[in-house]
Swiss-Prot record:
Family: Belongs to the DNA polymerase type-C family. DnaE2 subfamily.
Organism of origin: Ralstonia nicotianae (strain ATCC BAA-1114 / GMI1000) (Ralstonia solanacearum)
UniProt-listed GO biological process terms: DNA repair; DNA replication
Function: DNA polymerase involved in damage-induced mutagenesis and translesion synthesis (TLS). It is not the major replicative DNA polymerase.
InterPro entries: DNA_pol3_alpha_NTPase_dom, DNA_pol3_finger, DnaE2, DnaE2/DnaE/PolC, DNAPol_HHH, NA-bd_OB_tRNA, PHP_dom, Pol/His_phosphatase_N
Name of the protein this chain belongs to: Error-prone DNA polymerase
Length: 1075
């Protein structure tokens, strides 16, 4: 029996130079921060993150390594292909310095752009003989190269690979010696060593690390199965044979790499690591220069444009408060040299306005007088209590975040302007990291484990959107599985591990990164799913960590709707003069503080308007009863986790009610220092800025410390960094300044609420303006407003069907889509009877499902030349094929030419396709008597309307069901309005909205709609758990409950639910679910 190999004395130094994270999607089984933490715990000298043709995880690794005090090396792994495109060899490239990092990023970019999204293609010639603009990448200067031999390779193949790599990379080449504890380790070691000696390429120990811990091996297998789209049982040799791709301790490394040769290859890892001296902190970002006219400086040009804007905003006499704020802001901007950043955003906004594209800055930018004068934001900082430190801070030393919303249907014009101005080599969209959530992890893990697909879908459907980690086994048990079985427990455990894992990179909703030089030397660029779109490999959090400029070009549907409304009104006789517009009607021409508008808002008649249309907002409106613009600012912000978790909502409402009733003495302040901060909100903190100001005035925080508090509030859920701030506030405010502990505790809870989702005052102010404008238009111009909403879909909280119902409740007549009258968009038409009031809305051809825009345009053009005389005339002159005609017939849009939809469909079937009209057959057509088909019933018409239009103008579905519902003793929404508080009631309606706010402690709010209106239903958690299927899946919901009404706040508290969906038959309906 052989004696055991003695363990070495002392632990060797080691640097891991071949390590992938879960940013090698569906391959790596650990997060970057987990790998860093394990490398630091094992005492590694350095760690190289070498994800596959990617640096997407490097910023996370960089931040973790800085915190851990571990040296991080930036690198990447590649499969290099031969001239025929076949995989030939694998290697790792490591950046030695900033030039090497730039070369690495360009190499990754070249490979990624040469392949479809999610793939890459790197040819041997791309490294050995790149041409043109990439000639400087020949041999990848300033990068170390490590050849990765296959396991137990053919010596001849490895020799050829090593000789080629030696020729390309010279002395910067090493050869990896990886020992995965498999059957041929000794032979593998010998082959690699022999080729190393033959080619004079030194060996280096590397680990081929794919996980930080051996416990991740089951997850690694699942990822392999997902990547290969097959169950684990069918993956065979594609699975890693053991857990040896986990990080090894230095004791294990000493055991695997024994003897002098072993010690040498371990030392080589540290020597190579010492040659890499690059950190992401060295990245020097340079702002674009062309925004500054030739001959001017950035500071001088910004000052000139700001003062010109101030003159437009305020006239010749700029208020002293505004002038002082401008001076302060401009001085700080100059000190931090951020002028090009502001000018870049200004340039984009100026382009949009030149094209009559509505836009508006949002967020903390509304704290800035500079942004207001440049026209980036529309909230006058003089009208509120702005906190500039929230927007720009000296201590933060990073560009501020300026988000600009543009019309969602015209944002593409702005995007193309940016591409055209700066070029595709200097600008790209930020990435959005798509990660696994519960349901996607549930499905993918289930398939990997070989669980029946039907069972997977049943469990997935039972899993509600709000369910977390603890509910899975219970839901599986409800579907007939044993929740304690090893399979279900394994399923649940792997779902938990996979949740939050990166799945792939997508494109950010609108965050552009723009550079002065080649962007691809800062960060790799790859193809996005959309044509002509490119994304960088970092997301917005990565960019913020590295202080890189991101210009957010966001899309907002309400801006589209408002602009379309104003355009429609502008075309109506007398409307421009009515609003006092000298030329084109714009938002600024609408009157402020309109009484009728606020009356409508207080009645919660806000379906379709911006921000205050949700169930929670509608419930709050009759209680808060906004009467001024600033009331709307509070309204927008108060239905958020910050004020709710801080317990600030009810105290504010109570004080507001008392003041309204003539009792202002109820407004008290917790201390004299904070009175000025809280006066505008009746002594109750509502906004994030107020928390920051209280910290400064009563907690001893400096402005920069308050800004750190803001950042930690935003990151609390991820990092939990609020404890230190909360402890400091408690100590300073309670112990030193003797504030009421209950007030400070509530303030601390509010900080955590802002981490969930809270509006700063500046953000709420911008959104409140749009809420007011959209409310005014709904109140006074409902026809134009609802037509614009229909033309702006998809957007908003409510479906087109609900918007049409609301338009009718607003006394607007809606006419059906018809080829003899409809344009592509919905349009306004004067009432034919000459009566005054609102014009009619004629639904556009764009509402017809399956209708192609080009066909719709041809119909409109042909009709302008002469009216259509028949379906055949329509088909001929508008060049419509059978598909076009069939969708028009199904939508009843041929009614004027052919009669009801059955008759119309019959006629379209009789027509020949364009180009198939044979003269001989046409002359031989038999003479037939016209076939008259029976008209559909009203119920059939409604079902067909919903199938082709998503709505019906003929009847509400519940009107048809009303006799049956009455026999079941369900009453209408209109009848419920007369019920007394506490009365038992039954209601039935189509589910239109489900909401489960995180602050509602498990309560779900449901809206159901019948032919007379909507009913708001409250579902308590106990009922939800008892009747999950009805809550989640019912489309037609019967509710037994208790009616509650207080002033204008009315809802039905459910006690029992009935799923009546089968009564709808083939009617297509869907709800919009929010959480």
């Amino acid at each position: 029996m052989n004696a055991p190999t003695p363990l070495p004395i002392g632990l060797p130094d080691y640097a891991e130079l071949h390590c992938i994270s879960n940013f090698t999607f569906l391959t790596g089984a650990s997060h970057p921060h987990e790998l860093v933490a394990r490398a630091q715990a094992f005492g590694y000298r350095a760690l190289a993150l070498t994800d596959e043709c990617s640096v997407a995880g490097t910023v996370r690794a960089h931040m973790a390594a800085k915190e851990a005090g571990l040296k991080l090396i930036i690198g990447s792994r590649f499969t290099v292909r031969d001239a025929q495109g076949e995989p030939w060899l694998r290697l790792v490239l490591l950046a030695q310095d900033i030039d090497g990092y730039g070369n690495l990023c360009e190499c990754i970019t070249q490979a990624r752009l040469a392949a479809p999204k999610g793939d890459y293609r790197l040819l041997a010639d791309d490294l050995a003989a790149p041409a043109g603009e990439l000639a400087h990448l020949r041999g990848m200067p300033h990068c170390l190269a490590i050849l990765l031999p296959d396991y137990d390779p053919d010596p001849r193949h490895l020799l050829a690979q090593a000789q080629w790599c030696r020729q390309v990379f010279g002395d910067r080449l090493s050869m990896a010696l990886e020992l995965p504890l498999r059957h041929a380790d000794d032979r593998h070691r010998g082959t690699v060593a022999a080729v190393s000696e033959q080619t004079d390429v030194p060996m280096v120990a590397t680990g081929d690390v794919a996980m930080h811990s051996r416990q991740r091996k089951p997850l690694h297998d699942v990822l392999t199965a997902i990547r290969l789209s097959r169950p684990i049982a069918e993956c065979g040799l594609a699975l890693a044979p053991s857990a040896e791709q986990a990080m090894r301790t230095r004791m294990q490394l000493a055991f695997f790499y024994q003897g002098e040769r072993g010690a040498q290859v371990l030392r080589r890892s540290v020597e190579l690591a010492s040659l890499c001296d690059f950190s992401l902190d060295e990245i020097a970002y340079e702002y674009p220069h062309e925004v500054v006219p030739e001959g001017q400086t950035p500071a001088g040009y910004l000052l000139a444009e700001v003062m010109a804007g101030a003159a437009r905003r305020y006239g010749k006499d700029i208020p002293s408060k505004v002038r002082a704020q401008l001076d302060e802001e401009l001085a700080l901007i100059a000190e931090l040299r951020y002028e090009p950043f502001f000018l870049t955003v200004y340039d984009v906004v100026r382009f949009a306005r030149s094209q009559s594209i509505l836009c508006q800055g949002r967020g903390s930018a509304a704290n800035s007088a500079v942004c207001y004068c440049l026209g980036i934001t529309e909230v006058n900082p003089e009208s509120g209590n702005t906190l500039f430190a929230r927007f720009l801070s000296r201590a933060r030393n990073e560009p501020p975040d300026i988000d600009v919303d543009f019309e969602h249907q015209r944002r593409e014009e702005v995007i193309q302007y940016i591409y055209k101005k700066y070029g595709v080599t200097r600008t790209a969209l930020a990435a959005a990291l798509i990660t696994y959530r519960t349901r996607s992890a549930l499905r993918d893990v289930g398939r990997a484990l070989g669980i029946d697909l039907g069972v997977i879908e049943q469990v997935a459907k039972a899993q509600a959107w709000w369910d977390g980690r603890h509910e899975f086994a219970q839901r599986a048990g409800q579907q007939g599985l044993d929740p304690e079985s090893p399979l279900v427990q394994r399923w649940a455990g792997l779902i938990e591990q996979l949740r939050g894992f990166p799945r792939h990179l997508s494109q950010h909703v609108g965050g552009f990164v723009i550079a002065q030089g080649k962007l691809s030397r800062l960060v790799p660029i790859e193809n996005a799913a959309m044509p002509e779109r490119r994304v960088i490999q970092w997301d917005k959090d990565d960019l913020e960590s590295l202080r890189l400029l991101k210009v957010d070009v966001l899309a907002l549907g309400m801006l589209t709707a408002i602009r379309r409304t104003l355009d429609m009104l502008d075309a109506l006789p007398g409307r421009r003069a009515h609003y006092g517009a000298p030329d084109k009607l714009a938002m600024q021409h609408l009157p402020d503080e309109d009484t009728a508008t606020y009356e409508m808002i207080c009645r919660a008649e806000t379906i379709g308007v911006f921000q205050i249309e949700s169930r929670a907002q509608q419930s709050m409106l009759p209680r808060l009863r906004p009467r001024t613009y600033y009331d709307l600012v509070i309204q927008v912000a108060i239905v958020r986790p910050g004020p709710i978790q801080g317990g600030m909502v009810h105290p504010y409402l109570q004080r507001r009610e008392a003041v309204r009733n003539g009792n202002p003495d109820c407004v008290t302040y917790p201390g004299p220092e904070v009175k000025a901060v809280l006066e505008r909100t009746l002594g109750v903190p509502i906004f994030q800025e107020q928390v920051m100001e209280i910290a400064m005035k009563a907690g001893g925080f400096t402005a920069d410390e308050a800004d750190r508090l803001r950042r930690d509030m935003a990151a609390w859920k991820r990092k939990g960094n609020l404890t230190q701030h909360q402890a400091r506030l408690m100590k300073e405010m309670v112990e030193v300044r003797h504030y009421d502990p209950a007030f400070v505790e509530a303030l601390c809870r509010q900080m955590e609420g802002f981490a969930e989702y809270g509006f700063p005052e500046s953000h709420a102010a911008g959104f409140a303006r749009l809420a007011y404008v959209s409310s005014f238009l709904k109140c006074h111009e409902p026809a134009a407003f609802f037509a614009a909403l229909l033309n702006s879909q998809p957007m908003g909280f409510y479906s087109p069907s609900q918007l049409v119902q609301e338009a009718r409740r607003s006394r607007v007549r809606v006419l059906p889509a018809d080829v003899t009258a409809s344009a592509w968009d919905s349009t306004l038409h004067a009432r034919p009877d000459g009566a005054g009031g609102q014009p009619d809305i004629r639904l556009g051809l764009n509402r017809i499902r399956g209708m192609r825009p080009a066909a719709g345009e041809r119909i409109v053009v042909a009709r302008a030349q002469a009216p259509f005389s028949s379906v055949e005339d329509l088909a001929h002159r508008a060049a419509l094929d059978r598909h076009d005609l069939s969708v028009l017939a199904a939508a009843n849009a041929l009614l004027s030419l052919a009669g009801h939809r059955r008759q119309a469909l019959w006629q379209t079937l009789a027509l020949q396709e364009p180009g198939q009209d044979h003269a001989l057959l046409r002359q031989a057509r038999p003479v037939e008597a016209p076939l008259v088909l029976p008209a559909p019933s009203l119920g059939e018409e409604v079902v067909a309307d919903y199938g082709s239009l998503g709505l019906s103008l003929q009847s509400h579905p519940l009107s048809l069901l009303r006799p049956r519902l009455e026999r079941m003793r369900f009453v209408t929404a209109a009848a419920l309005a007369g019920y007394r508080n506490g009365q038992l009631a039954r209601a039935c309606g189509i589910v239109t909205v489900r909401q489960r706010p995180g602050t509602a402690k498990g309560t779900i709010f449901v809206s159901i709609e019948d032919e007379t209106g909507a009913v708001n239903v409250v579902l308590w958690p106990r009922l939800i758990e008892r009747q999950r299927r009805e809550v989640l899946h019912a489309r037609l919901l019967g509710v037994y409950g208790k009616w509650q009404c207080e002033r204008e706040t009315r809802h039905l508290v459910a006690q029992h639910l009935v799923d009546l969906t089968p009564l709808l038959g083939r009617l297509a309906s869907s709800s919009r679910d929010f959480h």
